[in-house]
């Protein structure tokens, strides 16, 4: 399956159902009164973390997600049915961004609210009072939340394998896990992160094989800048370094890799790290190993020839790697964020655009919310709408801008002549 770790999508939660104007009409029931029911809630959109997924490919093919609308109210005070909520599976490690701000970090196998459905409108039964016993007032359902989102996947792995291209990372992953990455004797065989579950006794952990890093990866060279983000969630790092091949300098390789990790995220250097010194069967190995130990005496090193490793060597490597994940191992900070607090941003109540030909166009989130919520289908609803817009100062502002009787005013889809 194609690996996709970044997509842009639009989510539109369901609109709430409209409340209705209705009066009880039954034989032998005089003056039955208002009985218009409320609209149902619009369906919300949730993301659900799924450990079985490892790509955002489904979102690459589906750019828009729409929620189900709530049903309109009915006579006899019957509330319309709520719109069905939508639950969409996403890979664990998916981050959701709204206007470049992180609003949701999906790190657990549970549901996360992404877009909330609109509230259902009230029927005329709710507007009865001692002064108005037969109100012809109702409300439309509110629109569901509508967001343009960026999704970014950072794989959820306990240990990240890093190293220069063709150092043996894919070979190691194939030996210690059930993963079957592509292995070949040329650089950049691994083009996307590969995950494998490593079992050791009654325990297990997830290891990620990241594409080979080169000097300058943190600033965009090679493929490193694309995939370095995937190591940010790891709890430990294993360096796989070629100690035996000709023209290889393990000290230089190790310094360059650590430098790229530090430039990308300094916290990565705080993680437990070990080095797997690969290709111990080649002539240059002992010389390079001795120099490396003198330069980095405190670094833990595991000697191996991965291509011909025996099972007991593989078990030792697995034990050493598992040992990096002790209970006291400090994890990188992962903040779980939920979008339930996201609301529409009502910065300005309205914006007036005027033209020389006596035309005024009114826009703005608050005025849009008012015109959308109050249906202009009765005299009482029109009076209620008039009171709402007068309260926010729209009429006064139009007068200041020189509106004259007969001028045309447009508020989204609603037009009228000023009187």
UniProtKB/Swiss-Prot annotation:
Q: What class of enzyme is it?
A: hydrolase
An annotated Gene Ontology molecular function: GTPase activity
Chief place of localization: cytoplasm
Q: Which UniProt keywords apply?
A: Cytoplasm, GTP-binding, Hydrolase, Magnesium, Metal-binding, Nucleotide-binding
Q: Residues in domain OBG-type G? A: 157-334
| Residues involved in Mg(2+) binding | 170, 190
Q: Which SUPFAM superfamilies match?
A: Obg GTP-binding protein C-terminal domain (SSF102741), Obg GTP-binding protein N-terminal domain (SSF82051), P-loop containing nucleoside triphosphate hydrolases (SSF52540)
Instruction: Tell me which EC number(s) this protein carries.
Output: 3.6.5.-
Q: Where in the cell is it found?
A: Cytoplasm
Q: Which GO terms describe its cellular component?
A: cytoplasm
Q: Which NCBIfam families match?
A: Obg_CgtA, Obg_CgtA_exten, PRK12297.1, PRK12299.1
Q: How is the subunit organization of this protein annotated in UniProt?
A: Monomer.
Q: What does this gene product do?
A: An essential GTPase which binds GTP, GDP and possibly (p)ppGpp with moderate affinity, with high nucleotide exchange rates and a fairly low GTP hydrolysis rate. Plays a role in control of the cell cycle, stress response, ribosome biogenesis and in those bacteria that undergo differentiation, in morphogenesis control.
Q: Mind telling me what this protein is named? A: GTPase Obg
């Amino acid at each position: 399956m194609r690996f996709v770790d970044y997509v842009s999508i639009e989510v539109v939660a369901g609109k709430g159902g409209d409340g209705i104007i209705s009066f009880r009409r039954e034989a032998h029931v005089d003056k039955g009164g208002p009985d218009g029911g409320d609209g149902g809630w619009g369906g919300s959109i949730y993301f659900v973390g799924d450990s079985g997924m490892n790509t955002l490919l489904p979102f690459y093919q589906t750019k828009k997600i729409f929620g189900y609308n709530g049903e309109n109210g009915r006579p006899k005070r019957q509330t319309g049915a709520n719109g069905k909520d939508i639950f969409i599976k996403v890979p664990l490690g998916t981050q959701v961004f709204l206007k470049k701000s992180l609003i949701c970090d999906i790190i657990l196998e549970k549901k996360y609210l992404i877009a909330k459905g609109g509230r259902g409108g009230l029927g005329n039964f709710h507007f009865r009072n001692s002064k108005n016993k037969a109100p012809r007032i109702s409300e439309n359902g509110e629109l569901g939340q509508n967001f343009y989102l960026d999704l970014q996947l950072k794989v959820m792995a306990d240990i990240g394998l890093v190293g220069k291209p063709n150092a043996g990372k894919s070979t190691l992953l194939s030996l210690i896990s059930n993963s079957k990455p592509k292995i070949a004797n040329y650089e950049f065989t691994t083009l996307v992160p590969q995950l494998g579950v490593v079992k050791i006794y009654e325990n297990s952990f997830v290891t990620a094989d990241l594409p080979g890093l080169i000097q300058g990866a943190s600033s965009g060279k090679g493929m490193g800048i694309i995939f370095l983000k995937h190591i940010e969630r790891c709890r430990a790092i294993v360096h796989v370094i070629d100690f035996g091949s000709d023209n290889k300098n393990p000290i230089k390789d190790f310094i360059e890799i650590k430098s790229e990790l530090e430039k990308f995220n300094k916290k990565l250097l705080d993680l437990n790290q070990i080095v797997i010194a690969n290709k111990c069967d080649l002539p240059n190995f002992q010389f390079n190993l001795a120099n490396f130990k003198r330069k980095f005496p405190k670094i833990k090193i595991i000697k191996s020839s991965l291509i011909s490793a025996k099972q007991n060597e593989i078990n030792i490597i697995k034990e050493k790697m598992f040992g990096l994940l002790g209970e006291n191992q400090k994890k990188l900070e992962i903040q779980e964020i939920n979008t339930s607090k996201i609301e529409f941003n009502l910065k300005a109540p309205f914006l007036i655009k005027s033209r020389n030909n006596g035309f005024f166009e009114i826009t703005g989130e608050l005025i849009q919310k008012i015109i959308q919520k109050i249906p202009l289908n009765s005299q009482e609803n029109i009076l209620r709408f008039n009171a709402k817009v007068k309260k926010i100062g729209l009429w006064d502002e139009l007068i200041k801008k020189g509106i004259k009787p007969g001028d045309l005013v447009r508020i989204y889809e609603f037009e009228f002549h000023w009187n």
